[in-house]
Amino acid sequence: MSISRVFGVGLFLISPFVFAELPSTNSSVERKIDAQQQKQQAEQDAAILAQQTQSPHVRLEGEKEASLSFPQNEAQCFPINQLVLTDYQAEEEKNSSASSLKLIQPSQFSWALKSVYAERDFALPACIGSEGINVLLRRIQNRLIDFGYVTTRVVVEPQDLRSGMLVLTVIPGKVGRIQLQDQSAIPFATRGTLWFAMPMTQGDMLNIRNIEQGLENLKRVSSAEADVQLSPSEAIGETDVVISYKQRFPFHLTLGLDDSGSKATGRLQGSATFSWDNVLTLNDLFYISGTRSFKRGSDNAEGDYGSKNVSLYYSIPWKNYLLTLSGSKYTYHQTVAGGLESYTYSGESQQMKANLSRL
């Protein structure tokens, strides 16, 4: 899932300092060098971030039934001029309320009724029999599944169709117990691991999209794996969510050497990154990285030159949100030959950033 799909709120601070032992007439050269180094710093930070973080995409699909055409001219049918979708009520709830059809409460899923007209082969009033009712149920059920309500069911309860009203009943599927089974060699998971990851609690409406988001949060660190199993609960309409979780060794050290630098401050770049997965057992990530340039003969630069970059990063997901904190410090120096003497350019850039995004 793209990590920041809806909105992002952030604080960003850049503090660049550039120094040069040269006349002010060379300020354009100074600005050019500084711009090159700022670009190089941004590229280095982006490369490290992409290497150390991941944005897992989890997609779970519910089983839909094939859609059928609405039958015409059924042998046994009832004239229906009103179609109503209502939520299921237990017997005690029914007995405590009036039995008049006028008091039927529309379902919270009434928007799904639009699906019965999608094929344009059905309109009210209509003569509807058992086959037609099954087609209507299937269309509404598939619509609910499309929106993630994979355990919500649509049924027909006993009723008198001579009234001209057909009432379809929705049995909302709710979340039962949420369990996390830690299968790691050394248990890493805590209550916070699950609570920070899952954007739902027991008793909420079960929507597969929330489960997908929870799995993505659990798998946000590279050393963690997670899978889910839905199982019937003892309570009517509830489904237990059982998550299998496994985390490997949480510490990583990455060394690198490439030629991504500039000729002015050194093409050859060496880097070292240390990362720690699940620092607070909240699916969070921390890393620190350092990069510096090394001299080589093909740089086409004379005198003293070089660059260094140190960056810190921390991220923590919380249900449907992601908080990231980052900072970096970049320094460089370069000697440029003048007409009579050489000049030394040096610069320093510091960045601090905080961002809160909705996933």
Regions found by a protein language model. Give the residues of each.
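Immediate N-terminus of the mature polypeptide
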Residues: 2-3, 19-212, 216-359
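Sec-dependent signal peptide recognition
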Residues: 2-12
